[in-house]
């Protein structure tokens, strides 16, 4: 009986969050805010928020304000939030907070805005500084040499003799590669071995470490390692060597920011240089009272 009540409560909460998001989207004040940054594309983008929430049981555990705020960040970059497209995503994340009353760390499900690798490439293209750019998985039979000191990478000249890419086996992946060429002629490349990317993920993602230690699948690094690896190399390449437009600088700061129930943005997954952000929906009265979300663990993927 207790289990049935718990399931019913969880389903009620998820329905409530979905209803809250739908209610907020229908408000004139919200429509106006999105129209200010997206123009005529705003209605289509708002509809996509509903679809994203409907397709994720984990997002339905997050506060509606958190979801809407993350979506608004994506809207300011004019990037779609369908994670399958690879530009940007709204990802559920367990943000640990200290409760002074219980003197314990407690997990709070929140929505996290994430730039994906195609999103960084898109913003770079829009800047008008870049002539060419790409990032790719590199298989072992495609790599001739890599010098970690100079950063120089040499690939085979005849890819027709390489077979591992067609096979697509992860154990044959040597690493991940990104490069760009500016209109000025300046060219830069970055290669990271699979081990280097793995170490990067372990260092900067508490969610990924939790997954590895507890055999879970709640982190984007666990469920889509390749996409996160490509994002890592292109982001590191651009942030170190690229010409960053204002939007690119903002995107690097906003990437993986989570929003709490008070509408404040912070980095919840080992991200440095915390920047506070105002919730654009904090002054908009919701038609439905938000229900308290407790006892839910995003690491328990359904």
Describe the residue ranges of each PLM region.
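Binding-interface segments
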Residues: 13-244
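Glycine- and charge-rich intrinsically disordered segments
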Residues: 1-32, 248-302
